[in-house]
Amino acid sequence: MPEYSQSAYRFGDYVAKFGVFPLGEEQKKLEGTYIKDDDPINVISQHNRDFHINNKVTYSFCAQLLQNLEEQPVDDIGVEWDEKKYPFEQVATIEFEPQDSWIPEFRVWWDDRITVNSWHGLKEHQPLGSTNRMRRVVYAESRKLRLKVNGYKDYIEPASLKEVPAPV
């Protein structure tokens, strides 16, 4: 199933929204599958774990470039940028070898200590628009609360894969 950035970002000297589209045959077979009402609450995480243990996954990473500010507003994420008029263009391929994506000690470490924030990137990839400016404030407050609840003073930013508590 495709995933989209919703909001706009700098893309070097350009402005773009991003999309990630499955390329693998096994991934494409999952399109159109649904969760049943009586499925267990952890059905998605368990299915993802089983799938990633047994399958390599490949995605097309695409950019939809801003070409017309009137039709592609940056400040109103409620306006969809027309894909027929302004198509996504592939800029990279992302591949993940089969792996256990739900190792308990890694999940706890990630949940308790890591923060994911689009404002931590390069200026060339800076988040744009009012939604992202609001996210900057909300993410900072959310991080503070999460650290306090989890009993930590600060989040960590691993300098190398050796600091990650998972086989890589």
Report residues per predicted region.
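Active-site-adjacent core segments of small-molecule enzymes
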Residues: 1-168
